[in-house]
Amino acid sequence: MSEDDVDNSVKDFESGEENEESIGRVILPNKKKGEMFGIVEKMEGASRLSVMCEDGYTRNARIPGRMRKRMWIREKDLVIVKPWEFQPEKADVVYRYTKTQASYLSRNHMLPEVIDIFK
């Protein structure tokens, strides 16, 4: 990395202009894999939660083992869930958004109106 590259990145940061890179950093649900947005309604214990999904259904979601200790999920958190193929009333949590990421998605109208509680 040359000094010119460093100077340009600092200039972009200082000017406050959003470039294409900043938009690409927020993870979005992969619709081809069946992933969707959801809002955590209730913690049910034992790594289970009740999630209101963007299609209007409330699903029983579970937190996979790889995320249990690493990512703490609370009520009213925005998450990405993937419904099970053989039991569509259940789902797995794929990703949890921070409050900053969720408000960014809401401001840029990337959330469906059904679950946009950040208005």
Swiss-Prot record:
User: Which SUPFAM superfamilies does this UniProt record tie to the protein?
Assistant: Nucleic acid-binding proteins
Tell me the SMART domains matching this sequence.
Answer: eIF1a
Task: Report residue spans for region: Disordered.
Answer: 1-24
Gene Ontology molecular-function annotations? RNA binding; translation initiation factor activity
Q: Which UniProt keywords apply?
A: Initiation factor, Protein biosynthesis
UniProt xrefs under InterPro entries? NA-bd_OB-fold (IPR012340), RNA-binding_domain_S1_IF1 (IPR006196), TIF_eIF-1A (IPR001253), TIF_eIF-1A_CS (IPR018104)
Which positions fall inside the S1-like domain?
A: 24-98
NCBIfam families assigned to the protein according to its UniProt record, in alphabetical order: eIF-1A (TIGR00523), PRK04012.1-3 (NF003084), PRK04012.1-5 (NF003085)
Function text:
Seems to be required for maximal rate of protein biosynthesis. Enhances ribosome dissociation into subunits and stabilizes the binding of the initiator Met-tRNA(I) to 40 S ribosomal subunits.
Q: Which family does it belong to?
A: Belongs to the eIF-1A family.
> What PANTHER family is this protein classified in?
EIF-1A
This protein is called Translation initiation factor 1A
- List the lineage, top down: Archaea, Methanobacteriati, Thermoplasmatota, Thermoplasmata, Thermoplasmatales
